[in-house]
Curated annotation (Swiss-Prot):
Gene3D superfamilies: Aldolase class I. Substrate binds at residues 9, 31, 58-67, 120, 182, 191, 211-212. The active site is at residue 60. GO terms for molecular function: orotidine-5'-phosphate decarboxylase activity. SMART domains: OMPdecase (SM00934). It comes from Listeria monocytogenes serotype 4b (strain CLIP80459). The gene is pyrF. The keyword Lyase applies. It catalyses: orotidine 5'-phosphate + H(+) = UMP + CO2. The lineage of its organism: Bacteria, Bacillati, Bacillota, Bacilli, Bacillales. Pathway: Pyrimidine metabolism; UMP biosynthesis via de novo pathway; UMP from orotate: step 2/2. This is Orotidine 5'-phosphate decarboxylase.
């Protein structure tokens, strides 16, 4: 998934269909999150796959290892390209998630699996006061990144602001998938650690996830092409 990943932050397939129709003939990388998946079920993945788009299924699993392993066996059968878990679930849970994907992938090629470190809506103050983590935000992200690597995962979800440090620690092949991406003209909304596509590229992101800058644009195709231009410059 080398192209910018478009977050399909919709509730219905009709909205998705209308949006994707604007990109007729284009193969996209898209993210299906909780809102869309829980509103429509697995059929939404099948319908998007029929249009030959790459899918990052963003459900952020976080439960006991056996439960996550069983869930991943099921998700692997959907044929998506990438899934994720919360790194806070721990090394054993992440290992179980990877094992579940391997069991459920009949083709022998499992989806990529990445772990959420800290949400891009989380500030250092929030983390320290609400999660009772007394280190810096960067130290927490780096710890979770290292734990994910040890568990055999393919990468992490992180802010672009932490991507270069993670690359240096865990290698260039370890994915740094970064949400919180906005065009310079757009509002940050509820995300705090936000950067532009160009800056994300320059400071070490391997993949970017872009939602509202594209989906809420007056001309989504033009906005996507602008993101693509900045990302590939």
């Amino acid at each position: 998934m080398n192209k910018p990943i478009i977050a399909l932050d919709f509730q219905t397939y009709e909205e998705v269909e209308t949006f994707l129709a604007k990109f007729s003939g284009e193969t996209l990388s898209v993210k299906v999150g909780m809102e869309l998946f829980y509103s429509n079920g697995p059929i939404i993945v099948e319908k998007i796959k029929q249009q030959h788009h790459e899918i990052f299924l963003d459900l952020k699993l976080h439960d006991i290892p056996n439960t996550v392993k069983s869930a991943m066996i099921g998700l692997a059968k959907l044929g998506v390209d990438m899934v994720n878990v919360h790194a806070a679930g721990g090394k054993k849970m992440m290992e179980a998630a990877r094992e579940g994907l391997e069991i459920g992938s009949s083709s022998g090629k499992r989806p990529k699996i990445i772990a959420v470190t800290q949400l891009t809506s989380t500030s250092e103050t929030d983390m320290q006061t609400e999660q009772l983590i007394k280190t810096s935000l960067l130290e927490s992200v780096m710890h979770y990144s290292n734990l994910s690597k040890q568990a055999g995962l393919d990468g992490v979800v992180c802010s672009a602001l932490e991507a270069e440090d993670i690359k240096q620690q865990n290698g260039a092949d370890f994915l740094r998938v970064t949400p919180g991406i906005r065009l310079a003209s757009d509002a940050a909304d509820d995300q705090i650690r936000v950067v532009t596509p160009e800056k994300a590229r320059l400071i070490g992101s391997s993949n970017i996830v872009v939602g509202r800058s594209i989906t809420r644009a007056n001309d989504p195709v033009e906005a996507y092409n602008q993101v693509l231009k900045e990302w590939n410059a």
